[in-house]
Amino acid sequence: LDPDSWQFRGGFFLNAGDSGMDWCNNHTHLIEYKGTRYIIHHTLHIQERTKTKGGFRCMCVDLLPYTDTEFPVTKATREGVTQTQPLDPYKAHSGAEMFTCADMWYEQISAGKMAVKSLAGGAWTYIKGVDFGKGTEKLLVTAKGMGVIELRLDDRNAEPLGVIELASDGFDKIPVVLPTKITGIHNVYFAFSSKDICLERWQAE
């Protein structure tokens, strides 16, 4: 990089500690999506809430309305941004595509392709704002492991609407028939009964 090709003009994003949160380092990424510009960063929100130690960071997104010539100074917020549109469940989604999770890890399937993997029984993933439209009673899930994955709506402690039974060391495509049609917009939880259950992909049909 030619040192004469640029000029330092100061910072544009405050440390989380300057925004009333715990202090932490940061790794940021700037992105433009549908005409709006954002900053992806991390905070210690989860560590604060769980009262733990060790730098337990979580990914966050905030608005950063920069232009080609100006970067206004902005800060991290606890609320973040609103969801830009509902998720379409009738398209296939990676198990790693989520809003948040607990007790989960990842297993690489191939270059750029990941599955989520439970670290313990009771692990879960949370997909926010899923629009089932006029409704479905069927899912197609690709998963492996020994145990079950439960589908729950709107509350991770809700009664399961569907149960995916697993007994395989390899990924299987499993059709799931639900006892009740799902309609409209819901938050979706996948709850894992035991360790080492992998969810690669899911889709409503």
Residue ranges, per PLM feature:
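Carbohydrate-active catalytic/glycan-binding domains of CAZyme proteins
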Residues: 1-205
